[in-house]
Amino acid sequence: MMSINLNLIMAFLLALAGVLIYRSHLMSTLLCLEGMMLSLFILMALLISHFHMFSASMAPLILLVFSACEAGVGLALLVKTSSNYGNDYVQNLNLLQC
């Protein structure tokens, strides 16, 4: 169980490093954020089942719902910036004025 937790924490840290390194393109940032959310979901589900905390069994599902909402908003931003500017650079996001 300890090696699985270590692998999931390393996956989260690698996705976080991906967000920090590849932050020029929006698509790369969104993929890294999805990797972070997926590793958090699996880690949370494994820890809840390992420690038999079934009162908190809805927490991974709530995290998954927020992850889906984040993906939807991120893809909407990606479509908006790529249709307006023709690329997916993050630096174009502060040019969007609503």
From Swiss-Prot:
Entry EC number(s): 7.1.1.2
Membrane association type: Multi-pass membrane protein
Protein's GO biological process: ATP synthesis coupled electron transport
Keyword Ligase: no
GO molecular function: NADH dehydrogenase (ubiquinone) activity
EC supergroup of this enzyme: translocase
GO CC terms, sorted: mitochondrial inner membrane; respiratory chain complex I
SUBUNIT field: Core subunit of respiratory chain NADH dehydrogenase (Complex I) which is composed of 45 different subunits.
Protein name: NADH-ubiquinone oxidoreductase chain 4L
Gene designation per UniProt: MT-ND4L
